[in-house]
Amino acid sequence: MHAALEIKEAEFQTDQVVGLVENSFTLYSLGQNGGPLESCCSSHLISDGAFQEIISLDGGSHLSALVELIQSKHLSVDSWSSITKYDNYTVENESYAKAWHLSEQRIKTFLITHCHLDHIYGAVINSAMFGPQNPRTIVGLNYVIDTLKKHVFNNLLWPSLDKAGFINFQVVEPSMYTSLTTTLSILPFPVNHGSSFGQELKSSAFLFRNNLSDRYFLAFGDVEPDMVASEPLNIHIWRACSSLIAQRKLSHILIECSTPDIPDTLLFGHFCPRHLVNELCILQSLVQSYGVIMPTLTCLLTHLKSHPLQSANPADVILEQLESLSSKSSLSVTFKILQRGQFYKF
């Protein structure tokens, strides 16, 4: 039998908003890199306050990231009476064994926003470890699951492990909540992710609901601004979330801001500061239409791109531009760069 897991929250950060029940959600990022480096790609662990049943939002990073974070003491897994299922088994790499066991015990679901490699790479490579005794469920909108079946788990690019019972695919509908754990449900939204050689690309956003506290958390995959999209889709999300923000039931948004301000022709289906602020101004107007003052919203920024020849840290430039534009627009939003290996509870 496996030993019970106790996770210590090293480098702990608590974000609290007056009026909210504490610890409705836990967020822990395994990777927030927007490229072009292949390390630390998009993967965010989401759970309730107990951090027992964990959903991996995207799977660009997984097992190797867990090993690294355990090894570096950013994630401590204690209370082990046995590392493996087998007696008299010598464990050469304890961090590897703990990461394997943590994934096996706690992370049963991968919620995929879209099928670009930087969002699925880790989950695909690691799927060989799952096994029919501990299968994982891969959840997504229909176009995500169709792409994974046809173009990834197809016995060409990667074995069809669903046929071997290693993984189960689950399609979720954009018009209804679906329970993924005992306490958390999701409401999916399709979003635009630009176009490539004339073909429109789609991604996803998910509104998480804690069914016990009736609190919410909004998380985006890669997303294109409505202002440049062929069909505006983000507005539907802002409309759905505005009443929740007005009621102080939603305080945090995980959203990308890939680069400092650049021309629209170079965005390739991503946000930059001016477009993010513009979208949030629309959201704030919708919230204020309920006759309330906009509560301060926390935007956790992810998918920042890097370049070896940049003279300034892109995160610093992005934050500076966001704060300047936000101030000019009287936007009630706090921007934070999502930190890998750090717990957020709200």
UniProtKB/Swiss-Prot annotation:
Which reactions fall under this protein's catalytic activity?
A: a nucleoside 3',5'-cyclic phosphate + H2O = a nucleoside 5'-phosphate + H(+)
**Domain of life, per the record?**
Eukaryota
Q: What is its EC number?
A: 3.1.4.17
Enzyme class comes to hydrolase
GO MF annotations in UniProt: 3',5'-cyclic-AMP phosphodiesterase activity; 3',5'-cyclic-GMP phosphodiesterase activity
User: Which UniProt keyword terms apply here?
Assistant: cAMP, Hydrolase
CDD domains (UniProt xref) = class_II_PDE_MBL-fold (cd07735)
GO cellular component, as recorded = cytosol; nucleus
The record's comment on protein family reads: Belongs to the cyclic nucleotide phosphodiesterase class-II family.
- Name by which UniProt lists this protein: 3',5'-cyclic-nucleotide phosphodiesterase
Name the species this protein comes from.
Schizosaccharomyces pombe (strain 972 / ATCC 24843)
